[in-house]
């Protein structure tokens, strides 16, 4: 957190193993969310062995990222088997609208039919409970990857997608399906 506050680097990027902003009710996530009987994420049932410290560390990281005075507050992560982008404007009582924290699910390269969260967990990735996020791309369960270009004044992202079962000949002509710039 001190590095985010004191760094003179143009960009400081956080790359946690579990995503920031979205959940599928998995055990090791930052969030206490579980899939409820109504098909929505909920915190009414305690998640087995979940620790409050996970969310407290998440909250500290988001506060430090939003407080950065240089560069883009940015998290890149995978592990939800999806492609997505959003700007976190609220986390609980914390208001980040002045400097939203950008979060990107960079995509899985080889998930099969039973590996998608909607198949394995019964829910696609959803915005975690207590998070306010402006999504420019809601989580999309497709194989793919993200190319991130770091420029002095901005970050440009290009997302590519692929679905198993499509002809391999299409890979040579793969084009980005979603592009966005983070100023």
State where each predicted segment sits.
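Long, structured stretches of catalytic cores involved in phosphate-ester chemistry, encompassing
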Residues: 1-183
